Amino acid sequence: MLNPIVRKFQYGQHTVTLETGMMARQATAAVMVSMDDTAVFVTVVGQKKAKPGQDFFPLTVNYQERTYAAGRIPGSFFRREGRPSEGETLIARLIDRPVRPLFPEGFVNEVQVIATVVSVNPQVNPDIVAMIGASAALSLSGIPFNGPIGAARVGYINDQYVLNPTQDELKESKLDLVVAGTEAAVLMVESEAELLSEDTMLGAVVFGHEQQQVVIQAINDLVKEAGKPRWDWQPEAVNDALNARVAALAESRLSDAYRITDKQERYAQVDVIKSETIDQLTAEDDTLDANELGEILHAIEKNVVRSRVLAGEPRIDGREKDMIRGLDVRTGVLPRTHGSALFTRGETQALVTATLGTARDAQVLDELMGERTDSFLFHYNFPPYSVGETGMVGSPKRREIGHGRLAKRGVLAVMPDMDKFPYTVRVVSEITESNGSSSMASVCGASLALMDAGVPIKAAVAGIAMGLVKEGDNYVVLSDILGDEDHLGDMDFKVAGSREGISALQMDIKIEGITKEIMQVALNQAKGARLHILGVMEQAINAPRGDISEFAPRIHTIKISTDKIKDVIGKGGSVIRALTEETGTTIEIEDDGTVKIAATDGEKAKYAIRRIEEITAEIEVGRIYNGKVTRIVDFGAFVAIGGGKEGLVHISQIADKRVEKVTDYLQMGQEVPVKVLEVDRQGRVRLSIKEATEQTQPAAAPEAPTSEQGE
């Protein structure tokens, strides 16, 4: 019989329910977590045995949103969910990052976590619910896992921290921060902010970690009642004798190799040392496993780099702990793009472009939480040549999506409002060289490219990656880390922002025991580095260019009466389509009567504005217009007087004498002056050629609404 075990607890303004034992009983563990009608079903399956020769931990986290959760049917051709969206990929990474470091060293059994959103309240984002579910399922499973973790979203509204704000509250918040950690320590932070101070950001991290203890307590209570027996897994015994043999052959040579400052030369030398050491040892004893020897060599590498940093010696490339690598900043490097920049920091380089488009180019995202339009796009590409390798080139991988989102968060706070700058903006960062912190190089390059494109960003932004090496109470915070320092260190801490404050903060911690004091040191050191980089960037370009590129579309804005919108659009869009083709422009009309005309040629834009003004102009009784004969009938002629408006000249109003046959006086296409006699209630217009020719008044153009240009 089904025997569900349930735990409920209050979490800020929400009630959270954990339920297990009801569904997916063949999985290693399964939990249904709900938070005010948003429910996520999370399963964990772990293999009892590792695959032979497995030398890494194969953890897979899948996060999937089902449209039935929001009471909808998918809009795709096949009417079913397809490959993961960008949002789903980002949440899968959000779950993966804090749980991965909590599996023990040497555990290489395959583990898969699947989180499925099965019900959604539009006010409660499922990401925090999914993280809590993954933590609970892993803790229940008996798999070696040093959890549980808690997860919290922190907002900042009216100078107050808000725990797990609703979607409506987030719109008012200056901060959107997700923090995850164990009972003792913070493990992961992901955030975007409206240029907040270091102290405010750190306060949010501490607040979120304190508040999530209730989650950890609830999961521990559930595990006591429903947890499976802990696996009898033990790490392989350390072979001290073999470790000593490998160290005797390789340690001093690896120490020398890590004094080579050039990345490619260093890697080549390290590969030679490893290869020669493994060959020598396997020749002496053919029972030795090359993979095991490789792991021992990697541990020696890690120890060499870390011990030198902790001893206060220069880093791998000869820098001191707070030194930034050499910077090279260039703008306007590509002639036909709307904005471009080449940002180089040491052996990390990003070629970044900014492209301007119209509102029609904005991305419409059909998400579970509702449809939204994104007018700022940021794409990050990491080709294999950037690290001197060959590899597959194609659709973006999880890492590229994650790095692109982080870089976008770094720039978002300084982007202009749509009403001031009505363009869709796409930034693309091509990583041409990489040796640490390419996402932060993308932030710097994006700021430069946007200024080069004439986008009126509120301030320049720069990003920096910090690292940490910690042994016991001894620690060193490193500025502008290399790829090796990221890989061999204990923390990856990325901060982006302007001179005024922080716009994005991402933190991934691989060890427990990172204190508030260490985070404070890292944030303050990052601020110094950020200000240094901004100073160099400002020497290349210190303000947005006064005008956008000649190759970018210029958007002109005019306002028409809302009851005239139908006239400009026409039946089935016929008028606006014809206008677009005739003028060579892009025309967009909003519900409030705002008309945006985009054109790369100013004359085309002026022509389009004139045509719209003609269409929307009111016909004035008693006024004379230049018209064109469009139809001839027995009782008169129809004459177009501009703006798609047509009136009837009765046969009696053609001349000041009796007219027997209309075609004796008028021909199709003939231009004639006409006077407006009357516009009846149905909008029908009576015209007179006779009265127009009697008057000496010159022909008039329709009166036009005022226009304003938004560039």
Curated annotation (Swiss-Prot):
Involved in mRNA degradation. Catalyzes the phosphorolysis of single-stranded polyribonucleotides processively in the 3'- to 5'-direction. Residues 553-612 form the KH domain. This is Polyribonucleotide nucleotidyltransferase. Residues 694-711 have a biased composition (Low complexity). Belongs to the polyribonucleotide nucleotidyltransferase family. It comes from the Bacteria. PANTHER family: POLYRIBONUCLEOTIDE NUCLEOTIDYLTRANSFERASE, POLYRIBONUCLEOTIDE NUCLEOTIDYLTRANSFERASE 1, MITOCHONDRIAL. GO terms for biological process: mRNA catabolic process; RNA processing. Its EC number is 2.7.7.8. Mg(2+) binds at residues 486, 492. It catalyses: RNA(n+1) + phosphate = RNA(n) + a ribonucleoside 5'-diphosphate. Keywords: Cytoplasm, Magnesium, Metal-binding, Nucleotidyltransferase, RNA-binding, Transferase. Its cofactor is Mg(2+). Residues 689-711 are annotated as: Disordered. It is an enzyme of class 2 (transferase). The keyword Cytoplasm applies. One of its GO terms (cellular component) is cytosol. NCBIfam families: polynuc_phos, PRK11824.1. The keyword RNA-binding applies. Residues 622-690 form the S1 motif domain. One of its GO terms (molecular function) is polyribonucleotide nucleotidyltransferase activity. PROSITE patterns: KH_TYPE_1, S1. Component of the RNA degradosome, which is a multiprotein complex involved in RNA processing and mRNA degradation.
